[in-house]
Amino acid sequence: MALIIQKFGGTSVANIDRIKKIAPIIKAEIAKNNQVIVVVSAMAGVTNQLVTLCNEVSSLNNISQFAEYDVALSSGEIVTASLLALALQEEDIKAQSFLAWQLPILTDNNHSKALVESITTDLLEKYLQLNTVPIIAGFQGTNKSNRLTTLGRGGSDTTAALIAAAMKAKRCDIYTDVEGIFTADPRIIPNAKKIKEIDFLEMLELASSGAKVLHPRAVELVMRYKIDMRVLSTFSPNTEGTLITSKDKNMENGIINSITSNKNLLKISVKSISLSFLQVANMITQNNNHIEFMQEIKNNEEYSFITNLTDENNLQALLTNLKNDKQIQDFTFDAEIATISLIGYGIKNDCKVLEMILSKLTKDNINVNMIQLSEVKITLLINDQDAEKTIFNLYNLFKIS
């Protein structure tokens, strides 16, 4: 008997009809003599609605306000967990919903982007022994002050991976509205191919570069704890998805396996005389604000940072306070940027790969603002209006399949 974690995303639970259709998927896994723990997201669109409501009543610029923001946002997953438990009970499957504080899932105090410190599994183990399917509300935790916290966007993926690690599960299955991971976005590249199997590290780079199927925190966790993960379609449950696992690779051959883009970015330009480049960077990274790129433009005068667009409210409040305190002279935001990332082992050491990219972009009059290289990824920072054209041309250049 194996333990399988099943996570269902927002589109999979978007309405009552879809929630009812999840029951046979869970039932089929139990029929294989496996134990199942389910993690759910909020219904599609609900979290965005809750964010809008919070923004209508609050400026969200202090810790107390973000604590209440977390309470509001977490309600979406709570509703889904209870509805799915009811749907399973109607199918004569014993099920019970669980919230983060009941286990508990203990986090730090960073409201809206908390990091998980520990998970107590006693309650989950007890209910599994009673042949009951635990339905966990994803995206949420609780801190040592007994205040509810949230894990940031994509947090339900993270919850599923954390539960898989804590429970030493055999596998973590992510059910979504697509049939797996593709070599490129099928909306841009209609002939993009589904990847049957992908290495943990390649998937991590793909997820962190804008591929929206999985959150990079979840991939990092299953990689760290060596737990296989599958990406499957709720709407075609019998279709083979993508397996994320350890696999052999040849580091010497520079082969592009996939390409992705990310427009969910924000460029911050900061002018400061009193604060150094590293001091400003350190302040930005507080409260788990993530920096993708950073650059000192003028010595001790002007700095540039690329962060997630979702951090805009936090950073607006931080930089406004610094400006009011005269620690910085000015700052500007620019959201009209995008990254294009090409993923594949050995591409950093194969000079021909970067040469081909730069030659093609020069020919196409695409302006590249920054380039970032790792062993398995080349990332280009460009203007967002050039993103789709660049993906299409580079996909065809490298004949990705």
From Swiss-Prot:
GO terms for biological process: diaminopimelate biosynthetic process; homoserine biosynthetic process; lysine biosynthetic process via diaminopimelate; threonine biosynthetic process. SUPFAM superfamilies: ACT-like, Carbamate kinase-like. The keyword Kinase applies. Keywords: Amino-acid biosynthesis, ATP-binding, Diaminopimelate biosynthesis, Kinase, Lysine biosynthesis, Nucleotide-binding, Transferase. Its EC number is 2.7.2.4. It catalyses: L-aspartate + ATP = 4-phospho-L-aspartate + ADP. It comes from the Bacteria. Pathway: Amino-acid biosynthesis; L-lysine biosynthesis via DAP pathway; (S)-tetrahydrodipicolinate from L-aspartate: step 1/4; Amino-acid biosynthesis; L-methionine biosynthesis via de novo pathway; L-homoserine from L-aspartate: step 1/3; Amino-acid biosynthesis; L-threonine biosynthesis; L-threonine from L-aspartate: step 1/5. One of its GO terms (cellular component) is cytosol. Belongs to the aspartokinase family. PANTHER family: ASPARTATE KINASE, ASPARTOKINASE. NCBIfam families: asp_kinases (TIGR00657), PRK06635.1-2 (NF005154), PRK06635.1-4 (NF005155), PRK06635.2-2 (NF005158). This is Aspartokinase. It comes from Rickettsia felis (strain ATCC VR-1525 / URRWXCal2). The gene is lysC.
